[in-house]
C-alpha cells in the first residue's frame, strides 16, 4: 500500500490591495503523511488518534475529490498530521494547506495522473478562491485570477532582501464573519484606488522600489472593515512603522498582521515583541521569508 508525506507552506493572501488576487507562500510549514489502508479511514495528529469524523476532514475531502477526478479506486487512509506550524484561522492559509496537501498526496498515490493545472483548478474549486491555494501549490508570490472554472496565475520575482514579520494573536477571526462585514458594493473611486495600488505594488516589488511599498499596500476594499475585528490593529501598525517597517497589511482575513522589512529585521522583532507583550492578548511574532517551491514530497 502506498505511503506519502508532503510539506505545505503557509500563505499570506490579499497583501493589501490584492483582494482574492495576490498571495505568497512563506517558510512556515505543515507536514502530512497518508497511507492507503484496507479498512476505515483514521485521522491522527502527530501520532495521536483523533476522534474527528473523517468525513468532515478537509485533507480527506481533498484526497477523495482528487481520486474521484483521477478515476482511482480507494478504500481507506491513515491520515497523520505530523507537523502543524501553520496556525488555524489566523489568516495564514491553514485550510489551503490541508487542501493542497491532500491533493498533492492523492496525485502522488495515483501515479501523478493530474497535471499541475488540474490540481490548481481543483484546489480553487474546493477553497473557493485562488489567492492562497496557488502560492501553496507553486511557491513564491503569485497573482491569480479566475475565468469561469479556469485559473490563470503569474509568479512575481521578489527582491531577496525582503523579509516578512507575522504578528499572530491568540484570538481567531472567523473567515465567514470577515467576509460578512464587507460592503456589497463599492464606489468607483474606491475601485480605482485599489487597482492603481495593486498594479504599482507588483511594479515596485519587481523594480525594488521599497520607498513606494507603504502606499502600495493601502486598500479600501477589505482592510478598513476587517481591522475592527482585530483588536489594537491600528496601534500595532503605527508601531511597526515606528520600528522600521516599510509596509504593513492584514494577512488574509486576519487575525495575523504582517510587516514588511528590508533591513534591521532582528531589531524590529525585538521592539515589536516588547510592545505586543504589553497588550491584553498574547501575540506570537515570527520572522519569515518567502517559500519559492510550494508543496513538495518529503522522503519518509
Curated annotation (Swiss-Prot):
ATP binds at residues 87-97. Gene3D superfamilies: 3.30.230.10, GHMP kinase, C-terminal domain (3.30.70.890). GO terms for cellular component: cytoplasm. Keywords: Amino-acid biosynthesis, ATP-binding, Cytoplasm, Kinase, Nucleotide-binding, Threonine biosynthesis, Transferase. It catalyses: L-homoserine + ATP = O-phospho-L-homoserine + ADP + H(+). Pathway: Amino-acid biosynthesis; L-threonine biosynthesis; L-threonine from L-aspartate: step 4/5. Its EC number is 2.7.1.39. GO terms for molecular function: ATP binding; homoserine kinase activity. It comes from the Bacteria. GO terms for biological process: threonine biosynthetic process. It is found in: Cytoplasm. Belongs to the GHMP kinase family. Homoserine kinase subfamily. Catalyzes the ATP-dependent phosphorylation of L-homoserine to L-homoserine phosphate. This is Homoserine kinase. It comes from Clostridium kluyveri (strain ATCC 8527 / DSM 555 / NBRC 12016 / NCIMB 10680 / K1). The lineage of its organism: Bacteria, Bacillati, Bacillota, Clostridia, Eubacteriales. The gene is thrB.
Amino acid at each position: 500500500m502506498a505511503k506519502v508525506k508532503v510539506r505545505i507552506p503557509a500563505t499570506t493572501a490579499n497583501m493589501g490591495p490584492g483582494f482574492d488576487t495576490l498571495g505568497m507562500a512563506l517558510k512556515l510549514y505543515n507536514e502530512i503523511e497518508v497511507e492507503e489502508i484496507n479498512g476505515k479511514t483514521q485521522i491522527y495528529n502527530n501520532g495521536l488518534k483523533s476522534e474527528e469524523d473523517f468525513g468532515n476532514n478537509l485533507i480527506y475531502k481533498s484526497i477523495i475529490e482528487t481520486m474521484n477526478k483521477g478515476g482511482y479506486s480507494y478504500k481507506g487512509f491513515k491520515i497523520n498530521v505530523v507537523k502543524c506550524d501553520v496556525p488555524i484561522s489566523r489568516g495564514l492559509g491553514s485550510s489551503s494547506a490541508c487542501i493542497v496537501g491532500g491533493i498533492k498526496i492523492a496525485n502522488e498515490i495515483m501515479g501523478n495522473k493530474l497535471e499541475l493545472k488540474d490540481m490548481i483548478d481543483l484546489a480553487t474549486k474546493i477553497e473557493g478562491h485562488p489567492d492562497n491555494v496557488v502560492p501553496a501549490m507553486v511557491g513564491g508570490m503569485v497573482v491569480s485570477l479566475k475565468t469561469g472554472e479556469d485559473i490563470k496565475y503569474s509568479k512575481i520575482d521578489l527582491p531577496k532582501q525582503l523579509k516578512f514579520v507575522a504578528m499572530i494573536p491568540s484570538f481567531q477571526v472567523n473567515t465567514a464573519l470577515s467576509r460578512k462585514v464587507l460592503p456589497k458594493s463599492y464606489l468607483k473611486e474606491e475601485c480605482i484606488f485599489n487597482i492603481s495600488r495593486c498594479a504599482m505594488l507588483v511594479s515596485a516589488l519587481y523594480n525594488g522600489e521599497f520607498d513606494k511599498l507603504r502606499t502600495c499596500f493601502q486598500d479600501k476594499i477589505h482592510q478598513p472593515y476587517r481591522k475592527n475585528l482585530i483588536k489594537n490593529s491600528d496601534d500595532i501598525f503605527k508601531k511597526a512603522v515606528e520600528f522600521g517597517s516599510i509596509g504593513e497589511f492584514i494577512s488574509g482575513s486576519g487575525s495575523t498582521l504582517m510587516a514588511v522589512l528590508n533591513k534591521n529585521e532582528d531589531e524590529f522583532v525585538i521592539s515589536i515583541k516588547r510592545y505586543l507583550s504589553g497588550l491584553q492578548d498574547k501575540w506570537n511574532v515570527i520572522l519569515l521569508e518567502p517559500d519559492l517551491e510550494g508543496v513538495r514530497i518529503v522522503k519518509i
